Amino acid sequence: MKLLRLCLDQIGVGRPLPWNVYNDAGQLVLRQGHIVRDEAQREGLILRGAYIDHQVHGEATDTQDLHAVREHSASLWQDVRTRAEALLLEPGEAEPFRRGMKVIGGHIEFAVVHHLDESLFELLHREGRNTPAVSHVIQAAFLANMVAIRLGWPNAMVRSTVHAALTMNLASLQRQNALHERARPLDVAERADMAEHGAQGRLLLEMLGVEDRDWLQAVAHHHPPEDGRSLTAWRHTAGDMACLLHHVDLYLAKVSSRAYRAALAPDVAARQLFHRGGGAANPFASALIKEVGLFPPGASVRLANGELAVVLRRGELAHLPEVCAVQGADGMALPQPVRRRTSEPAYKVVAAVPRGVVTLPAEAALH
């Protein structure tokens, strides 16, 4: 039996469970029809890990309305952003912090398994604007989860990676929010100062009672030293989790704009990451690009007929994503977004365009 992890808003208080619920060892915890009595029991299930049979879930979701799936995904990520902003900007006491991290990590794990394309769209096309530094680490945690699974890491290591991604900038979130709108890049002194935030973050996490050595190591070393050291040498010191976080962090920085520079198109960012990172010999860059693709959901693309479109889902083939045209070849917005078949010559994807150039109305994305 293949198990899929549940997230908080899939379990209703006072409502019968629609499936049997298992623990991570595959042992039955609650039978279908059991009524979760209160919020404490619901949250306790999530913290301990609540799972359902993959096959049963598949039968249930085959008939789900796509609109409902996408609405659920949008709601899920709004909840993640709200929780993450409260938890990361003001961590507070140790026990609530660790409990909150488990809940947020569970939400992200659930989204990777159940709503992968919809979540990529929400994160890359409709990122939160109030706290860009928090949005960045949420995006990093989601991508790191995807890539860690592709790399074949065990579940415990995947979860540690997600927690490390969420907290890799814990010591510098407020500063990074301010830097996001600054009109010039960091100077040498500022870069040296920022380079310490990994070690500072580790100290903060230790003060919050985090004892996971892999998590702490990844946060402390997710930025490689600027000493010309090779990936192999740095990987030996920092560990695989830190190396993965660095590559995810770098990719997201490339596809995000700043006040002093434009964003790169995702295909350009992917190629830069691949070639400058050592090509196929770099397992982290290779796995990231294979997972995200050249035209990920949320990316803006130009079609052969001159239209601009937004990618809704990855296709069976990397160059054939599902897209929705929003702007005509004349530069005018279309009256209504229109689905295009990228397998047809007129609607072939010829290039990606930088993030933020094209916006898809929310109602169009949900239908």
Task: Describe the role of every protein-language-model region.
Residues 127-137, 160, 234-237, 241, ...:
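Conserved phosphate/pyrophosphate-binding and hydrolysis machinery centered on Walker-type P-loop NTPases
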Residues 194-197, 240-256, 263-272:
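Active-site-proximal alpha-helical segments within enzyme catalytic domains
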Residues 165, 205-246, 260-261, 272-278, ...:
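Histidine/acidic-rich helix-loop-helix segments that form or flank divalent-metal centers
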Residues 61-195, 202, 206-209:
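Acidic/His-rich, divalent-metal-binding segments that scaffold phosphate/diphosphate chemistry
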